Amino acid sequence: MALAYDGAIQRLIDAFGRLPGIGPKGAQRIAFYMLSAPEDEARDLAEAIEEVKAKIRFCDICGNVCESSPCPVCADPRRDRSVICVVEEPKDVMSIERTREYHGLYHVLGGAINPMANVGPADLRIPGLLKRLEGDEVKEVIMALDPNIEGEATTSYLTQLLRPVGVKVTRLASGLPVGSDLEYADEITLGRALAGRREA
């Protein structure tokens, strides 16, 4: 029979165990670390979690996370407004920004088409993307979705949807492992994939 802890410690283990990428043993290690950590460190963590839940929202323009809308990327006049890079999640924006190779804007879909999880085009921020393409300022849309089945399905769907709009639609060059997530790609590989993008 598995050892279970009483009350607060088990609640903490269970809470950490619900986080992505944290298994039961990892959750237990983190919980016991927090138990022996200085009180101010535990308080800092709790306050940081509360603060992010209270202050962070999604940019009204691109869907990236921010404290005030528009986000710093959309508000930056130095960004190239003729290019929009479409990504699945805000974490993908961070991955691309780390490359220091991309200077355009972003559009965060909030996921990818996944029939197994009942996620269809209507569940994504596609109308916002189309609205941003209404003027003639945007010349290129880069599809930077995860190289997995869901990312490929979403890229294919959006490419067909955007062709009549008249913008150039490109996708990241090969080099990213199939079935992986953008957030796990190193900066050099991701930078080369951006630089070598090809017509979709």
Swiss-Prot record:
CDD domains per record: TOPRIM_recR
Residue ranges constituting the Toprim domain according to the UniProt record: 82-177
Biological-process GO terms, alphabetical: DNA recombination; DNA repair
GO MF annotations, alphabetized: DNA binding; zinc ion binding
InterPro entries: DNA_Rcmb_RecR, Rcmb_RecR, Rcmb_RecR_Znf, TOPRIM_dom, TOPRIM_RecR
Keywords for this protein: DNA damage, DNA recombination, DNA repair, Metal-binding, Zinc, Zinc-finger
Annotated function: May play a role in DNA repair. It seems to be involved in an RecBC-independent recombinational process of DNA repair. It may act with RecF and RecO.
Name recorded for this polypeptide: Recombination protein RecR
Natural source organism: Bifidobacterium longum (strain NCC 2705)
